[in-house]
């Protein structure tokens, strides 16, 4: 495995260079702006390329050392792409609504996840002893919890890295990451504050094609990290004095 390749042409075709209308910009984005055309800011892709490459390396390195990456994107055009890419790379996601305290109050979130598991147990069984109305209420509760927490139910703790689409919309998530010292990789459009992000990637955060490209590249970087982790485990096993029983390796890059 290797880090995913991408080209300037791919970025252009996906519309990564199109920012917002010039009057909507955040002046802190000035270093990343190439110019403007028809009152639309044009993002400098010559800076996007190395910063995106750096972010992909960070994702791969995090996963290679056993870390967890949380994909966050709740806007309509990002929601499905965020979930699909996280599942494909055996990572975690929030794609419906960021609940306040999702990271900073993990204990309460863990209790809700336990409730979700319990509801699964009840409803996947015979669910005897419940009236039709009671069962319907349980199904609605499970559906609500699964929508909010389904993407993090198996995370087992706070993540080691967060990947975020739309830093303005997901400001609460970024604030919580900062409080806990969780590094953030994020797309920064012309109306964003780059100072909030550890690993900024200048680019359009609204176009579906651009979001699809980011999600695909981040997912493939995570899959590369899984391959590196498994390869390192294999080397460690081979270096052992006594040859252990060979463990069954689970393919972490398969699609969920």
From Swiss-Prot:
The record's annotation in PROSITE patterns points to: RIBOSOMAL_S2_1, RIBOSOMAL_S2_2
Q: Which GO terms describe its biological process?
A: translation
Report one GO cellular component: cytosolic small ribosomal subunit
The GO molecular function terms of this record are: structural constituent of ribosome
Which Pfam family, giving just one, matches this sequence?
Ribosomal_S2
Keywords from the UniProt entry: Ribonucleoprotein, Ribosomal protein
The protein's matches in InterPro entries, at most eight in alphabetical order, are given as: Ribosomal_uS2 (IPR001865), Ribosomal_uS2_bac/mit/plastid (IPR005706), Ribosomal_uS2_CS (IPR018130), Ribosomal_uS2_flav_dom_sf (IPR023591)
Gene3D superfamilies, per database record: Glucose-6-phosphate isomerase like protein, domain 1, Helix hairpin bin
Q: Say if the entry is tagged with keyword Ribosomal protein.
A: yes
Domain of life, per lineage: Bacteria
Q: Does the keyword Ribosomal protein apply?
A: yes
Q: Which HAMAP family match?
A: Ribosomal_uS2_B
- PANTHER family, alphabetized: 30S RIBOSOMAL PROTEIN S2 PROKARYOTIC AND ORGANELLAR (PTHR12534), SMALL RIBOSOMAL SUBUNIT PROTEIN US2M (PTHR12534:SF0)
Please report which protein family the annotation says this sequence is part of.
Belongs to the universal ribosomal protein uS2 family.
> What name has this protein been given in UniProt?
Small ribosomal subunit protein uS2
Species per Swiss-Prot/TrEMBL record: Rhizobium rhizogenes (strain K84 / ATCC BAA-868)
